[in-house]
Amino acid sequence: MRIGALITFLIIVTTACKQNFGEILVINGLTMGTTYSIKIKTNNNANKRNIRNEIEKILSEINQSMSTYIEESELSIINLSKSSDWQSVSDDLFTVINHAKKISVKTEGAFDITIGPLVNLWGFGSDKIENKIPSDEIIKSVKKNTGFQKILLDKTHMKIFKSNPNLYIDLSSIAKGFAVDKIALYLDKKKFKNYLIEIGGEIIAKGENAEKKVWQIGIENPNANNEIIKHTIRLNNMAMATSGNYKNYFKKDDISYSHIIDPATGRPVEHKLASVTVLSHSAMNADALATGFMVLGPEKTLSLANNLKIPIYLIIKNDKYFEEKYNDYFAPFISN
């Protein structure tokens, strides 16, 4: 889930297009069930139509490969297959699944791209079923068909094998970050040195904006008062991703059940972590880590992030207010 309302990430950019040192090409649209916004500092000789077309092509190809909503997507075909054979996959799909497994190991299983059936079971998935509390027996039964360890990869031949044929893979927690990285790679190859890419809250920024200043991201004050912006984050050659939990939940008997499902228990998490923001050189990496950290909770996240030297910013929900915490690796990126 990407954050809105109390915890909003606002891209602070100049709206003036033309300057004597170039202009900002803005490309907006819809992809992967969300919005995207790309700002590129160009010169007057840039083929803007071609840039837009190439970016739209990249997004379309990723969606056609990794969407679970497109019946004939590459991933949907794998999910529907009950084959006991190894299946060939595209380079992009292999890259994303391979990285997802690495993050699963790094987060001790907290990040898991196979828990879609559990998310659906609790009424938070694409099936749109009624929110209800499943029995222990049903949770145990569904959990048998989950587990990132059941995805085997052949790096030599770019193939995937599901040791459980009922395994269902959902890349929504990592694919947007991958798309951000791939567009950034395209812009780098085209020698663009200044841009900002955002897809569904996943961001990567490089160089300067139209005012010759480093791109800045404003973090809204979670405790609503006259101070709208709590911090301004300076991003250059860095990616940022945020995942959160406070808004998407249901209540039964005065107990709140979060949409964040712990793969280990098959149940919603019960900690007070409302959101986590991760900085990384890769948007795909930040995207997946943010999701995994939301499962771990504040204490384990701070400990693991410090051990791995990952910059993180946490919002923790207390009884009457939101508390912020960030580690020493995140502090240098705060400009106010």
Model-predicted segments: where are they?
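Mature catalytic core of soluble alpha/beta enzymes
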Residues: 2-9, 14-336
